[in-house]
Amino acid sequence: MDEGTGLQPGAGEQLEAPATAEAVQERCEPETLRSKSLPVLSSASCRPSLSPTSGDANPAFGCVDSSGHQELKQGPNPLAPSPSAPSTSAGLGDCNHRVDLSKTFSVSSALAMLQERRCLYVVLTDSRCFLVCMCFLTFIQALMVSGYLSSVITTIERRYSLKSSESGLLVSCFDIGNLVVVVFVSYFGGRGRRPLWLAVGGLLIAFGAALFALPHFISPPYQIQELNASAPNDGLCQGGNSTATLEPPACPKDSGGNNHWVYVALFICAQILIGMGSTPIYTLGPTYLDDNVKKENSSLYLAIMYVMGALGPAVGYLLGGLLIGFYVDPRNPVHLDQNDPRFIGNWWSGFLLCAIAMFLVIFPMFTFPKKLPPRHKKKKKKKFSVDAVSDDDVLKEKSNNSEQADKKVSSMGFGKDVRDLPRAAVRILSNMTFLFVSLSYTAESAIVTAFITFIPKFIESQFGIPASNASIYTGVIIVPSAGVGIVLGGYIIKKLKLGARESAKLAMICSGVSLLCFSTLFIVGCESINLGGINIPYTTGPSLTMPHRNLTGSCNVNCGCKIHEYEPVCGSDGITYFNPCLAGCVNSGNLSTGIRNYTECTCVQSRQVITPPTVGQRSQLRVVIVKTYLNENGYAVSGKCKRTCNTLIPFLVFLFIVTFITACAQPSAIIVTLRSVEDEERPFALGMQFVLLRTLAYIPTPIYFGAVIDTTCMLWQQECGVQGSCWEYNVTSFRFVYFGLAAGLKFVGFIFIFLAWYSIKYKEDGLQRRRQREFPLSTVSERVGHPDNARTRSCPAFSTQGEFHEETGLQKGIQCAAQTYPGPFPEAISSSADPGLEESPAALEPPS
């Protein structure tokens, strides 16, 4: 630098700044353990010295901003600063302090952000995190579809006047939506980013769940007409009005009867959306897990996912039983017992809860990549390269296997062209073993579908318990028994190492035993209640038969009763009446327990003791008249008459046994299905079985079971000319029809699994006979070594290891004897036997 230039740096001085910075960095190179573990401390510790030391006579001071430019430079011969200039040491201190703080904050914030992003990336690319999301997704879907909906279906029927066949249609729409998109999702989703497809499916499920709850918010509020103090005679018999007749129900424009099909359409659309959204869960989710984890961990991950799916229905039944114990409108609670048929439970809140939970679960699904990177263990650093190679090898092995499978499938005619699809379908369906086991599995699946859908309704109507308790009993009995049965069936197959033939025999035995156990369900039940005007007459005239059902009689024909609201009362004669008006009751009052008491009931004139009819008198009722004490007319209390039936516990025990034995056959059916086709045909065979199950079991079963159940109804809801839900069933007919149809399906399944077992046996026996014809046994040693020979079974040493093995069983036996008893005699036998034994394989060759 020229002396006349003062403090202005020249071109050569600007080049000295990087050298000074490098010198500062060289003095800061040594790192400590703390600086390595905490990079922020390392960057903050490397600072140039602000004061000259004794060892540095001509120090260079510099202030470098964030852009790397030098603000102040002092050469080896510094000039004295001007009086107006600030102190050099003070300026340098402020500059370095500001730069150090900015560097510290910027570096620390950047490192913290990078660390957070790295942690988030590691979490969202971990197969275990995907497994957790997949488990919750499967759990919520199974909870809502297989458990919660079945537990609240009877409540929805009463609220929106649905028949059992219509509610069965709602259940079937889930599988309809599933069947519509399964080919599209499986084909395009398998080649795309599968977690994204799962997330979109979760969105559809959430929207469908919210849509299912929409009728509660758009329908008129549910109202119950109760007697109050302002109108004490409302709903009672107006005996003074001789011209009063039965009044038809009023039909306002916004009534539920006029909008009946609107609500049904909303339910159907919601179920179809849920079915479409559920398709990727069981088609893309398992394949994504299997393709992105090690082969030895794949089965464990899939087992955890399916266990969560199995727990969903149980929790769904329990959740439904809990929620429908509350009134449907929390803002307007009523004081009604759950046994009152007018009580409607809170059915809609569970769908909103499932929708919210599904929204929370699917957000991480959007972030998972198309392919997860291999996961390595951090603790074992020495084996890092080995682990990486093993993971890559596993993934390469899976891809190679898939490519080889595609080549084999293409060579057999599968997957080449869409036009080959009919030929492939005919090839699969012409396999009698596969066809028989698929039809048997379809019949069993139809029974399971009928049980899951309508068993809460059966328990509620058969034993007269609230819908909430029926749902809880179903969740406690059905789901655990099915889970234990499936696990036991799989354990038996693994423990005994059963093949296709033995697995078919196990399934046949389980089907036969469960068919016999069905007989217990017919005899364990209750009798129908005596409902005045429906299954028992009002008066005791000369004829005690019921030629037709009529709610009116001589005792209530002039009361002007309304018949659109079912408000049962129990008369002192042990008969249940439709409402207090039809019982002929004139006065009412509240008891201390909250139960309403009705007096002066003209239809309850005498106490009738009903005895069971004798054989041949099923249509007649034997009535014993006993005069009522204290008053001429009878009295009644609100609610149905209690039934003396104590068979609920035995029924639940027998139901557990039947479900358990039926579930034991499911793993056997799957094994027979996989073993009955070639390895290359298995994916297409499972797809064909999927279509058979949906079209023959899952879709039609709820509809025709619901239609058959409707035939047992003895009291229908009538609202605005629309026949709504069933108020009372003939529970005896319900029991025989329901379990009779299920037993018929069980018998059909037994026949088909027997045919599947016989077809396997026929094929194996035919193959064995063909081998015997092609390779006849000509020598004594071969006959002794044959597995069917008695000597071979008693002495395994003589059995052969193969058809063309050089060392036969007889030769091994001679060598064993020579080693055990050494001497000239065994050696002579061995040497003389060798030439003959060497020729034995030639005898197995087919004759020319």
From Swiss-Prot:
Regions of this protein lying in the Extracellular compartment: 150-168, 221-260, 330-344, 450-469, 522-651, 710-742
Region (Disordered) residue spans: 1-91, 821-848
Xref: InterPro entries: Kazal_dom, Kazal_dom_sf, MFS_dom, MFS_trans_sf, OATP
Sites carrying sugar chains: N228, N241, N469, N550, N590, N597, N730
The organism's taxonomic lineage, starting at the top: Eukaryota, Metazoa, Chordata, Craniata, Vertebrata
KW Transport (keyword) present: yes
Residue stretches spanning the membrane: 129-149, 169-189, 196-220, 261-290, 310-329, 345-369, 428-449, 470-493, 498-521, 652-674, 684-709, 743-760
Domain of life: Eukaryota
Domain Kazal-like: 549-603
Membrane topology: Multi-pass membrane protein
Localization annotation: Cell membrane
GO CC term, one of those recorded: plasma membrane
Keyword field contains tRNA-binding: no
Stretches of the chain found on the membrane's Cytoplasmic side: 1-128, 190-195, 291-309, 370-427, 494-497, 675-683, 761-808
Keywords: Cell membrane, Disulfide bond, Glycoprotein, Membrane, Transmembrane, Transmembrane helix, Transport
GO molecular function terms noted in the UniProt entry: sodium-independent organic anion transmembrane transporter activity
Family matches, as Gene3D superfamilies: 3.30.60.30, MFS general substrate transporter like domains
Family affiliation: Belongs to the organo anion transporter (TC 2.A.60) family.
GO BP terms, alphabetized: sodium-independent organic anion transport
Name of the protein in its database record: Solute carrier organic anion transporter family member 5A1
Biased composition annotated in UniProt, kind: Basic and acidic residues: 24-34
Biased composition (Polar residues): 40-56
